[in-house]
Amino acid sequence: VSPPLQTLLRRTTKTLGRVAKVAGERLAKAADADVMLQRSMAALIETAARRYPLDPGAQWRPGEPLKLLFAGYSGTRNTGADVRVEEMIRQFRHLFGDDHLDLSILTIDPALTRGYFKTVKQLELPEIFPRFMFDAVHQQHGVIACEGSMFKSKFANALSTLMVGGLGLAAAEHKLAVGYGGEAGKMDRSLEGLVRKYCADAYIIARNDASVAQLNALGVAAEAGTDTAWTFSPAPDAVGRRLLMEAGWDGAQPVLALCPINPFWWPVKPDLRMGVERAVLGMHKDAHYKSVYFHKAGAAVEARQDAYLSAIAEGTRRFLRDRSAFVVLVGMEMLDRRACEALNAKLGGGRPLFVSDEHDMFALVSVIRQASALVSSRYHAIVTTMPGLVPSAGITMDERIRNLMADRDQPELALEVDDPLLAEHLEATLARLFDDPGGVSAGIQASVVRNLGVMGRMGQLLVEYVRARHPAFPIRAGLGLAGSPWDHLPQLPPHVARLVHGPEGQL
């Protein structure tokens, strides 16, 4: 390239950069994309309420199957989100029967949920979803909001706006509107207002008491429940063992599974300036999430992430000085691959990676069920290994893992992502998991059985809600609050049934 042309290209690039920056700043000042989305959703809920007297949409009649739409975070290969919904669907099918249900579920990418959610129609969710939800809910008899982080600004306001939108639209058309097993936490003021206004007529069975209190403070009635992943049945152990052996495991050495994340790049927020700069100049690729949404980024985020991964690597190295273990790195969501690769490098490389972009939820959970110990920053990696009594600890960014360890009476097994002594504490924690697996597993078993009972009670509450709204709906005798919570669970995998019937069980 000739020097004059090089000069022209440099000037053109600078000009484009200035144009992109100015355009982005003007767009950002003109509108907050999160608030715009919330206002759009609110307007359509109000429109649905006005439309209802003239056009109520689908309304259940005796003899028809009950049409329910599950609204969540499926289609991103987030293993936890998919597992909890898989079990939710199994519970609904158990309670109401396939002959009486017509189920649909939202998915961000149908290719990533292919083979999941048997008997359920998958509906692709567009990036700009308010009008889609307005039309889709109109054709249903009810909405089941099923995202775990149901009412939170911690990860993305857009996701909670989707949850509120589904519930609000269903309530506006006098349909079933249920939030099932989700959490409420700290919310931006605009999202809090949306929840307060449009979830007041929904029925929320939250994941814990803290969420109930949070919702009650907003004037939203809620019952306490639990997560719904406890009954999940992964692929057979032989699948997990085969995958591990293909990765170099000898079949005998203890397996240590580490599940890192990037806890510092949340929340995902819209940034129109960055969106313009990415489109025009290809900038911000590492921070880009989707559309005009970007992860929190910058030198401070990178430094905190590096410190977190370095501490995990150092604590693991110290532990392995006198121990032998086959270390594997597990990404429970596709987004975790970068963290797994970075941790692998800090451990010297050569550690096998098992990430959800390559392994479905059945295979991935089968892999981690083979571990002798698990340390995870992913809540559902811990939950899905607990029925297998895998000794586990967490390195947590929020209250979910803290609450889980407290429920096990093992709060000391919840480490913190920003602990300046994380390496030291991790070394000691790994020693405990390997030296006292029976003691750790005893707390795990009691917690699993307790949470299964709570999940059964959630089924009882759900039955009573449907019965009150649709007295003519054919519900089996013995179901509801007059029955046993254990009859309201889907079929338990054999090893889980043994936990329930064993010395620590309830039956």
Stretch-by-stretch model annotation:
Residues 2-507:
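Active-site anion-handling motifs in enzyme catalytic cores
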